[in-house]
Structure formats: C-alpha cells, structure tokens
Amino acid sequence: MTVSSIQAKQKVQSSPVQGVWSLVSYGVDVKETGESFAPMGDNPTGYVIFTAEGRLSFTLSAQGRQPATTAEERSDLLSSMIAYTGSYRLEGDRWITRVDVAWNPSWVGTEQTRFYRVENDQLIVSTPWRVMPNWPEKGMTRSIVRFQRC
C-alpha cells in the first residue's frame, strides 16, 4: 500500500473540528458499576489533528511513561497509550474514522465512532459504550475526552 492509496480522495467541507487540538483531560466511565477513573493518570498528554484533506491523527499517552528495559515493561507500554490514524467523515454530532494504522492491530480496518461538540475553543468528545482493549476486564466503558484548540 502506498501513501497515496490511503490519502482521502477529496477535501472535507470546512468544519469546526479542523485543526490541531491539545488534550486537556481523559476519563472513563464504567457502565456496570458507575465508576469513573483516569486510566492514563491525572495529566496525560495527547493531540488530535483533523486535516482539510479528511485525515485524522489521534495520540494519547499516559502520565509518567518511562522507557522499557524488559519485554514485560514493553508489553505494559501498549496499555498506556492510544494512537490511530485514518480518513474521517462527520455525520451530525459524530466523527467516524476509518482506521488504517493503530497502536492496536485489532482497530486497523475498523470504523471508530466518536460523539463530539465544540464549545468555544474546546472539543468535548465521548465514545459509544464498548469494551476497550486497554482494560477489557472493566466491561463496557465510555471515554470522555476534552481538548483545547492549539
């Protein structure tokens, strides 16, 4: 596959999400228990970038990640980040990304749906309820993510 074969074929209509957004907060709600938790710590880092050409890049990294020295530590690093990219489209209050590269191979080839709203220079995002590969033991969860326009 060449880079040109994964590029969006046409520009997305101008929208309020286009541009670069910096992570402000990331939390998760657990459907079964009502629990909320911050799986990436109180100060995770990340960005989401929406291009006019219809590409999205999403990266979220846990607070305090350190270089790994063992195979087990390298394995643990997989659950302390989320990263994916692909072409996106907007449908009402949803953005839908057709994932072509991801930190977790099970996402490649899928469509990831996110609900969003823009309030001033903030992008507030939530996921549908789903089992997240980073913490499957929690069952159905929903992520709530807040970004600030850069």
Residue locations for each model-derived region?
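Lipid interaction determinants
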Residues: 2-83, 90-150
